Structure formats: C-alpha cells, structure tokens
C-alpha cells in the first residue's frame, strides 16, 4: 500500500518545480541554517564525514558545496592494473550484464531499449549491441562525483531532456523505461578497450548535472537535445581523461550507466545486483591480456560521429551545439 502511494506521487507531484526549488535552496548561503540542514542530513543518512577533505560541516557555505564534497585521496585508491577498469562511482549496482541486442535490464522482468537510452541514435547503439552494461545507483549518503573507469578521449556529449522520476529501487521496478525517459547526459569516449559510454541520469531533486570539461550542462532545462563533438586522438582541442580522474558530478541523487562494446571486457565475477561500489575498485577486466597504459585508443571515424547525429530522429539540427 505504501509503495503504491509512493509510486502515485511520482506521477502526481510537480517534479520539475520541486527540482528547481531544491536546486535553488541548495545553492543559498544561509549560515547557521545551512549547517543545521547539513548536520541533520549527515545524521539521517549516516554520511561518513571522516572520508571528506573537510570533515567539519561548518566549513561548507552551501548545501551544494557539502553534497559534492571532495574526498581525501587515500580513501579511494585506484587499481593500477592496466587490464582493469574501475568503478566510476560510490553507490550500489542496480543491474549489470549483457546487452541483449537492443535490450538492457532495468529490473527483474523489465527491460528498456538501448537505442531509446541513446536518444534514438541507432549508429551509436550499434557500437554497444550485445555488449556489456553496468547501472550504478548513487544514494543520498554517497559521494556524488563520477570518475573514469579507464583512460579515455571524449568524442561526443549529448544532453537529452526528459522526465525527472526518482531512480531508486522502487521506481526501477515499476516505472517502464525509466532510464530512457529521464533527463540524461551521454558521454562517448574512445578507450583502450574500445568505445565506452558513461551516461549521467537525472532524477527528482537533482539540481544539476556537471562535467569537468563543460561545467553545468543542466539547468537550464530548455527541452531540446544538444550535442557536442570532439576530434579523435590527443590534440589541443581534445578532452583526455585518466583512469580514476573525475569526469562529472551530480548536485543531489541519481544514477550512472556504463556501456562497453561487445567482446572487450568481462565484468568482475563477484559483482551482482545490489553489490556496493567504491570508486577505484575493479569493475571489469580486459578480454585482451596485454593492454598497456600507453596503448592508443581506436578512434571512431569522424564520418561515423556525423552519421550518428544524422541518424537520431530526436535532434533538431538548428538547435544542436557543435
């Protein structure tokens, strides 16, 4: 009964206005009131402040500063094996496994479309059909910066407007096509392990999604798909990130979805749904034994990137950001 009521609220409540209100409040400097809210949050969610670079809650001027607090370097050591891809976020694995052609598992008995997740871009989807996916849920108590599983060179970023449903276990089991419906930022990288997508999914009360190379992607929420591309290889204009390096952050809540090409990686055997994740711990292992740190990522051809753009029925060329 209670779960049915919670689900009903997901459809009834004005999620966009709640999210805007939360974002506004979380960015305000309110002195003692800010500290009180942070202290109550820490107590309620049992946040481990000993891991933070600034463990004193009085040192945060806004709730957002607290929420995206950096951790001490030593608390999240990065696995240095060049054959190992590491976890991109602190949280819990919602689902993981093989992408069955165009189907990704959302929850037991519920699938959603790979192509829909990628905003109808069937050529980008072709890179990952029958590949591997991992969905990581970040709870309110978790560290909310997102890091790189491996070295990567950014090739494309797409902002997809959408709903703002919560992305917890209850909604994943009951809201059809949840991750393909919600607002999200799709980041496509060239890596030593083939193409990799890292997708930051928004949710109710998620005030903003940011990346280290472009800053705040949303808000504003303009209701249009936006797209940016970068050249292949390392050059003055490229965005090259190292394994374990921060790539983005959420200001409140949400989910990260990783997509890997078929035949390139094997997920760590011990991982399963509801496994706890910590940044830097092993997530997957290369199917090729002798990957070196200096291996050159295989770039996607420029014409393929452009073809992906043309293939997406949801993109308005006049409004693209290239």
Curated annotation (Swiss-Prot):
Enzyme class of the recorded protein, top EC level: lyase
Catalytic activity field: a 1,2-diacyl-sn-glycero-3-phospho-L-serine + H(+) = a 1,2-diacyl-sn-glycero-3-phosphoethanolamine + CO2
Keyword Transmembrane found: no
Cofactor note: Binds 1 pyruvoyl group covalently per subunit.
Cofactor needs: pyruvate
Principal location: membrane
UniProt keyword annotation of Ribosomal protein present: no
UniProt entry keywords in alphabetical sequence: Cell membrane, Decarboxylase, Lipid biosynthesis, Lipid metabolism, Lyase, Membrane, Phospholipid biosynthesis, Phospholipid metabolism, Pyruvate, Zymogen
Membrane topology category: Peripheral membrane protein
Function: Catalyzes the formation of phosphatidylethanolamine (PtdEtn) from phosphatidylserine (PtdSer).
This protein's name: Phosphatidylserine decarboxylase proenzyme
